Every structure is written in structure tokens, then in C-alpha cells.
Amino acid sequence: MNDQVDLLFFAAHADDIELSCGGTIAKSVRDGLRVGLVELTRGEMGTRGTPQIRYRESQRAAKILGVEFRYQLDFGDGGLRTGRDEELELIEVVRRHTPRVVFAPWPDERHPDHVRTGRICTDASFYAGLRSLQTSRPAHRPQVTAYYLQNYVLHPTFVVDVTAAWKTKMRAIAAFKSQFHDPKSKSKSKSKDPVIFISDPKFLGMIEARAKHFGALIGVEYGEAFVTKQPPKLDDIIAAYEGREP
């Protein structure tokens, strides 16, 4: 495992990352960037599957995406803890992996665990840069915290073209067989798990529709949207809008 990464993605639960930014991860890996994934909970409050099943599925998805590592913390699902102990643990994670960019959920999402994840990851990324805050590793502050979108649609700060990585993203999502509808399944037996919003056959169609919407904003087939609290720097204005019409 390579501890140092360029991009570090945080999520509350396994599969949050694939749904929101799996294409960006796959594209970044193809572009030669080192990527790591960290979930803050084991998903023990999930309606479908078990923590053990979801962990195995997450590791299969990680191999499909080609990331350097993926592991879980244990901040408590369905009431994610955000005290000082958890904050210090995340500070240590950021200092250990020295990412240039941290990704986290937008901190005003529908699910309370997503809200708390976005907020504590934002705070920890900042505090990780304080030299006076001593831990077992030296201070490190990422260049920016970028927020991915889940339930709510916001005006994006930037959109990543994930058209070439779309099939990889969907393969990674399909690794979570306990969570989502599998249109290719030939099994006639019905799952004993309850049907929920994300296991409905229409759900993955919604994910694709959203990606097509964000892709249309930048003139491509599929896009994934992100929000930052400060605008990015552009070195080439023409290239940034290539293939677009006013």
C-alpha cells in the first residue's frame, strides 16, 4: 500500500463514493494520480446486507477502480460521532496520506451522517495543517477540500468529464450486489432484504440521468459535479471551454 496519495476521498458509507464520484476516481487513476478511499463507518445500520458483506463488496469495487487503498474507520453508523477523538483520528489520516486534494460530501446533505462527514473532514483537513497541533506525524494541509453531490443538486464549481470512465464507474457500483438492482442477474429468487430507494431498478437510471445532466453542462456525455468554497485557477481559458458553445 502506498500511503501517500494525490487525492483522498472520504465518505460516510461504502458505495457513497462510487455513486457520486466513481468516474472521477477511475479517470484520475488512469491519468496516473494516486487515489485513496476512506469510509468513516462500517455501515452497520444499513437496511440491506451486513457490515462484513459490504466491506467485501467495497474491496472488490476498490480493485475495479484501481485505487491505492480503501479502509474503514468506526465512527458509528446512524449517528456518526464527530467529537475531538474522531477529529484527531481524521487529522492523523490526512497527515499520514498527505493528499493534495480531499473530497468529502457537501456538508448540508439529506442524510445526517453525510452532513457530519462533510463537516468533520473539512475541519480535520484544516487542523491537519497546524504545526502547533502535534501528533505522531508532521503537519500537512491539502490544497483544497472539494465536495461531491449526493441527494441535492447545486450549481457546480467544476465538472469532471467522466465519459471514458463511465463503464468502470458502473462496474464498481455493480460490485455492491447487496445494495443495488442487478439487471443482468439471472437469479429467479428474490432477495430477502427489503426493497429500498437505492435497490429500486429506477435508481441507477437516476444516477445516469444526473451524470448526463452535468455532462451536458460541459458538452460531454457524462459528468460528475463538485463544489469548492473558492474558485479554481485556470491556466488555459480556451482549453477549459473547448468543444462548448455559448
Model-derived regions, located:
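Active-site rim/loop-helix segments in enzyme catalytic domains that contact anionic ligands
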Residues: 1-97, 227, 239-245
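Metal-dependent de-N-acetylase/amidase catalytic core
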Residues: 1-8, 84-246
